[in-house]
């Protein structure tokens, strides 16, 4: 993961296509992609392969996912729904959820998350 501040100088432009790809949530999810952390926000370009995704988990901080390609099937707050291309998913803090790429194809999305917990040394993803 890249950092927004490098040797005291801010980096202003990030090229996701040339950044290192890695597993983004460890064993909690099949998500892979590139990410960086700014002073207060985590951002990533994430891909979930067709029919794969996350186990039930939550983040102590607020999260937004904007779907660029494909669709995500989400279970959250006792509801199941699909988030299609061009739509934004809001995940409130501490909300248990799963997100899986639909069987129709891979899903690619941008994720933004507050990093208050990370700065406090707390886990940023908690599997349930």
Task: Report residues per predicted region.
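Short acidic-glycine-tyrosine-enriched beta hairpin
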Residues: 78-93
């Amino acid at each position: 993961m890249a950092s927004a501040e490098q040797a005291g100088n801010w980096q202003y432009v990030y090229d996701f296509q040339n950044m290192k790809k890695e597993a983004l949530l460890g064993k909690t999810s099949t998500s892979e992609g590139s990410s960086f952390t700014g002073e207060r926000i985590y951002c990533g370009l994430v891909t979930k392969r067709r029919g794969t995704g996350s186990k039930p988990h939550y983040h102590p901080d607020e999260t937004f996912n904007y779907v660029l390609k494909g669709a995500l099937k989400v279970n959250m707050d006792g509801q199941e729904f699909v988030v299609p291309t061009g739509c934004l998913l809001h995940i409130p803090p501490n909300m248990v959820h799963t997100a899986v790429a639909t069987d129709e194809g891979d899903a690619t999305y941008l994720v933004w998350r507050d990093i208050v917990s990370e700065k406090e040394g707390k886990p940023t993803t908690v599997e349930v």
